[in-house]
Amino acid sequence: MLTTNMAFLIGTLLLNAPGLVNDEVHCLTENIYYEARAEPLDGLYAVAEVTYNRVHSPVFKKDTACGVIYQPYQFAWTRSKYPIREPAMWERSQKVALSYYYFGKWVKPVVPEALFFHSGKPLGYHSRLTYLKQIGGHKFYSL
């Protein structure tokens, strides 16, 4: 299994390879950037992991990262996209997205059962979920 640090190094190498950024990698990069760009590296991988946990969950009924990310009312940033104001954080997010997309099954899980997360004040439905752990400013939950 790869640690998140090792996976990030792979992402750094992949960033320079032509043709690897497809729609799925782009959607995953956006989700990581808008949801967790200032979080520790494990937090970025946790957002990627939650995204793909949703892809593989029958609850969300979508089979792509773009599908689960753009499902209505799942991620607040999708309702009003903001410009990329921190290029270094975008690049960091893209390295995580690339490494997770191409090598995710070999990355040691950070939040293996998580389907939900939040930062700040929890919403009402969080009380019905099972709390798993906190990474940086995010709390992660399963059903």
Residue ranges and their predicted role:
Residues 1-11:
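Sec-dependent signal peptide recognition
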Residues 10, 14-143:
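Bacterial extracytoplasmic/cell-wall-associated proteins, especially those involved in peptidoglycan
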